[in-house]
C-alpha cells in the first residue's frame, strides 16, 4: 500500500481559513492555490497550453515550500495528434533534473491499437522515467463495455512494449462511473479531484491532481498541480529500472 507521508515528521500547520474559489481553504497557500496538507512530493503536468517554459527558473521550485519533483508531459492524443512541445520539453525535463513522465489523451472513438502504437512511436522512455500514462476523460459516446475494452486494449499494448504497467488517469467521478471494474485496479491510479481537502476515493491511488489553476514560477500560464501519495523513495521505486528498448 502507498502511504501518505508527512512533511518532515510534523503535521501541516494550517493557515487561517481564507476563501479559495468561494470555498474556505483549510490547508496552506502555495502556487496561488490551497495546497493539500502532508505531502512531501509535488509535481505538475504540462502540454503546449503552458507556452514556453523557463526551465532554469522552474528548477528553483525544487527548493520551495512545496517542492516540485516530477513533471508529466502530454505526448500524444488520439491516433495521430502529437503535442508539438513534447520532444523539446521532455528532453529539458530530464536535463534539468526532474522525474518525468509522458501521457496520452485517449479518444474513445479512435482505434485503441492505433492510439497505443502512435504513443509507442512517439515516446522513448529511459531508466528513471515514470511509467506511461493513459488519460481518459470522455466516453466518446461509446457504451461502457466498448470503453472498457478500448482502454484495456491500449493498456495491454503499451505494457507489452515498455514492460511496465501504465498509470491510469481519470477524474474521481469518471472512474466510479465507467472504469470501476476490478481489472483496472492493477494499474497505478492518478486521480483528478479538485476543490476538496482530501481524496475521497476509497481505493489505492498514487497521484492526485488537485487543481488546474496553479501559478508556478517559470511557467507563463496556469498549470495543473499534483501530489504523489508517498515518499520520494517510493516515487523512485515506481520509475523504470531499465531503458525501454524496441521489443
Kindly give the residue locations of the regions a language model identified.
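Structural motif
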Residues: 3-4, 36, 63, 199
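Substrate-binding cleft of extracellular glycoside hydrolase catalytic domains
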Residues: 24-31, 35-155, 159-161
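Hydrophobic single-pass membrane-insertion segments
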Residues: 14-24
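Catalytic domains of cell-wall/extracellular-matrix polysaccharide-remodeling enzymes
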Residues: 130-202
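Functionally critical loop-and-helix segments that line ligand-binding/catalytic clefts
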Residues: 26-50, 56, 180, 184-247
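Flexible, glycine-rich phosphate/dinucleotide-binding loops
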Residues: 80, 109, 175, 198, ...
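Short, structured coil segments at secondary-structure junctions
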Residues: 7-8, 96, 185, 203
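Single conserved hydrophobic/aromatic residue that forms the stacking wall/gate
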Residues: 1-8, 12-15
Amino acid at each position: 500500500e502507498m502511504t501518505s507521508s508527512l512533511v518532515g515528521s510534523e503535521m501541516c500547520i494550517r493557515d487561517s481559513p481564507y476563501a479559495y474559489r468561494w470555498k474556505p481553504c483549510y490547508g496552506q497557500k502555495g502556487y496561488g492555490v490551497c495546497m493539500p496538507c502532508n505531502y512531501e512530493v509535488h509535481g505538475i503536468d504540462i502540454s503546449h497550453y503552458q507556452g514556453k517554459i523557463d526551465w532554469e527558473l522552474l528548477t528553483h521550485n525544487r527548493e520551495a515550500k512545496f517542492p516540485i519533483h516530477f513533471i508529466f508531459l502530454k505526448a500524444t492524443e488520439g491516433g495521430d495528434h502529437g503535442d508539438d512541445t513534447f520532444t523539446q520539453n521532455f528532453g529539458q525535463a530530464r536535463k534539468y533534473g526532474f522525474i518525468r513522465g509522458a501521457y496520452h489523451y485517449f479518444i474513445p472513438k479512435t482505434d485503441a491499437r492505433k492510439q497505443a502504437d502512435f504513443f509507442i512511436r512517439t515516446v522513448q522512455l529511459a531508466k528513471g522515467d515514470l511509467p506511461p500514462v493513459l488519460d481518459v476523460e470522455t466516453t466518446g459516446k461509446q457504451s461502457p463495455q466498448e470503453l472498457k475494452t478500448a482502454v484495456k486494449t491500449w493498456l495491454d499494448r503499451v505494457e507489452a512494449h515498455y514492460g511496465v504497467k501504465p498509470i491510469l488517469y481519470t477524474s474521481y467521478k469518471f472512474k466510479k462511473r465507467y472504469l470501476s471494474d476490478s481489472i483496472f485496479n492493477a494499474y497505478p491510479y492518478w486521480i483528478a479531484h479538485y476543490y476538496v481537502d482530501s481524496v475521497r476515493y476509497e481505493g489505492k491511488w498514487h497521484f492526485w491532481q488537485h487543481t488546474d489553476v496553479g501559478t508556478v514560477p517559470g511557467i507563463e500560464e496556469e498549470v495543473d498541480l499534483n501530489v504523489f501519495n508517498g515518499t520520494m523513495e517510493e516515487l523512485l521505486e515506481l520509475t523504470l529500472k531499465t531503458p525501454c528498448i524496441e521489443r
